[in-house]
UniProtKB/Swiss-Prot annotation:
Primary role: Component of the cytochrome b6-f complex, which mediates electron transfer between photosystem II (PSII) and photosystem I (PSI), cyclic electron flow around PSI, and state transitions. PetG is required for either the stability or assembly of the cytochrome b6-f complex.
Family in the record: Belongs to the PetG family.
Lineage: Eukaryota, Rhodophyta, Bangiophyceae, Bangiales, Bangiaceae
Protein name: Cytochrome b6-f complex subunit 5
Annotated keywords: Chloroplast, Electron transport, Membrane, Photosynthesis, Plastid, Thylakoid, Transmembrane, Transmembrane helix, Transport
Annotated organism of origin: Porphyra purpurea
Length: 37
């Protein structure tokens, strides 16, 4: 009964983590453009 719960949590965390990394990279890129780097 625990394995489906763990797999569901992992499957839910993967897209959240990926989107978080994409947002962080995008904000860093925008900040770099504003500074003229």
């Amino acid at each position: 009964m625990v394995e489906p719960l763990l797999s569901g949590i992992i499957l839910g965390l993967i897209p959240v983590t990926l989107s978080g990394l994409l947002v962080a990279a995008y904000l860093q890129y925008q900040r770099g453009n504003q500074l003229g780097l």
